Amino acid sequence: MHGNRDFLLGQTFAKACGMTLLADPTVLVFDTQRWLLSHGDALCLEDADYQQFRTLVRSAQWQQDFLAKPLVQRQAMARELRAQSQARKASGAVYADVDRSAALHWLQACDASTLIHGHTHLPADHTLHSVGGSTHLRRVLSDWDASAQPPRLRVLRLQCTQAPQRIDLAVSGLE
């Protein structure tokens, strides 16, 4: 599933790597439950600047124009965007979180009980209650940064007949 930095990956690359690109959002049916998977950025509705940027860079025309530029220029643009993002983080700017109503709407439209997403990277579980009284869960994944101290390499493991587990691969390794 495309995220902030890999939205240019296409079907040709995915096929060459043996990957399947997932639409955002995607419903995963596992162990008799419907799980809604999303990058999560489309649900951060209060971050108007980011939504505008997202719309721009996900457009076919922008991507075609970007990929037509020389590699050196594309790398410079990517570094500049990353530097802007890091500066915003360092400034202590508050980021918009997922819009609860939009998340609940997606869950109900897909008949899913749990939304699993990243983007906000504030790992936690959030309970969502609908007007009709049904309860849904939003599970937020951490970001991945192997060079951070300590490394952030956390996953959510789904197993049949067991509750999902958050696993820190930097501590436990693959099991």
Annotated model-derived regions:
Residues 1, 5-8, 53, 117, ...:
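Broad hydrophobic/π-residue packing in well-ordered secondary structure
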Residues 1-5, 78-83, 91, 99-105, ...:
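Generic detector of short, locally flexible boundary/turn motifs and exposed helical patches
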Residues 10, 28, 43-45, 147, ...:
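A generic signature of intrinsically disordered, low-complexity regions enriched in glycine/proline
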Residues 1-32:
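Core catalytic region of metal-dependent phosphoesterases/phosphodiesterases
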Residues 38-99:
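Active-site-proximal loop/helix segment associated with metal-binding centers of metalloenzymes
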Residues 166-175:
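Short, solvent-exposed aromatic-acidic interface loops
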Residues 16-25, 34-36, 41, 47-51, ...:
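Conserved beta-sheet core of the metallophosphoesterase superfamily
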Residues 1-3, 8, 35-39, 57-64, ...:
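Low-complexity, flexible helical/coil segments
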